[in-house]
């Protein structure tokens, strides 16, 4: 059977059940959830005018020279197209230097989104969780930056910090060039999907954590998003319920202290930005409890949170739920919400 996103992500999160075993044993034994009969990747969102091209006209490498913790031999780029011919998805692997792809609206209104695609930290799904985001929100006047972040299992050290380093650095680089991009740096938020939702949640709860040595003046700026959208997110590597099912998703063999540190649901404070969540109740890969626990923790911390939980939708739908699904309205609801919450 052709490899698809849910197979790979399922293997990634399934490995978390074996967190106490060696990395090699985890890799060999990680179960892959069976796909529902007839399942196909979601149809790419293509409004009038067609989708923007990849790569974008403006691509900005985030790190001058080698990124932090680089291996002796950098990963080699390995983009692939996946899924049936009518529903192809572009996946990025082999990320040697994190980069942001800039998508500018015809009439910028000053708002901006850092879009963080998912992929189980094994690839970056830039089609339905990057290009589609740019197309939709550009039409509303929002400048979109799609983050292609380094993948932990491609040789970086410490592996579990590489994505957060990239997310922090992206926020700072964007803010350092706000005038050039015609955005208000105070209106820059983040929108993350699945593993990218984990990274977005990690960013909003660890934006001030020192995870790399400053490299230039941009690193004096804040990495804190003004707001966050978390779409079917993994919100903790160890969940409040005690489940360790996501423990190996980011990097095998992490210590309990590192697992706690990279479990953003446990780190929500009065400083955490407002959040908007979307999660299908029937998601077979990232359980709805991830979002429910986030809401409970946000309420305990007194932080605003809003959510949409369609009964049906599965995982990885991006902006592509069927029109007769009430959850298909989430991009419009989120767009309205962000205008009231800093965007």
Regions found by a protein language model. Give the residues of each.
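N-terminal secretory signal peptides and thylakoid transit peptides that target proteins
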Residues: 1-16
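Short beta-strand/loop motif that positions the catalytic acidic residue
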Residues: 277-279
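Primarily recognizes the serine-hydrolase "nucleophile elbow" in alpha/beta-hydrolase
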Residues: 172-242
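Mobile cap/lid helix-loop segments that gate and shape the active-site cleft of serine hydrolases
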Residues: 80-87, 217, 226, 233-267, ...
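C-terminal catalytic histidine-bearing segment of alpha/beta-hydrolase fold enzymes
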Residues: 292-343
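Short beta-strand element of the alpha/beta-hydrolase
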Residues: 110-118
